[in-house]
Amino acid sequence: DRRELEAEVIGTDERTDVALLKIKADNLPVVHIGNPDVLKVGQPVLAIGSPFGFDYSATAGIVSAKSRALPNESYVPFIQTDVAINPGNSGGPLFNANGEVIGINSQIYSRSGGYMGLAFAIPIDVAMDVVEQLKDKGKVSRGYLGVVIQDIDRDLAEAYGLAKPAGALVAKVMPDTPADKA
């Protein structure tokens, strides 16, 4: 409804780039939350945002992949789309064809810095879990093992006498971690 309101930051999570804000307002419009687990590759999606300050812009595309991990990122099971995401779109909703929010547009993957058809959204169930933890504990807790894992390539498979290069090798156990104590 285009109202602008003051907000208090309750908590933030750097890994997912999700923040929980508190506002004082009545009669706010609501969106329906969808289930990103039932998404299929090829399904249509719609992103809404304010690219370059152009308010209420919508761009459409399809789901390109699910549970996508990005290089050099802590694991978040991103929804990959080909929706045009530009500066100002991040943080906006990603809708399914039923008008339900299934994700939060997060980032693009680009060598040039511009849109190249690779956009990523945080699944809404992941974002909602982050929000619940921020609300309940003021922070997000994540489990960790404390190991460095290495993919088994052909050379490692041969060195260890494996029939084929598959799986992972625990390359290092970090000190004073759950793995170290186990």
Where are these regions (language model features)?
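Serine-dependent protease modules
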Residues: 1-181
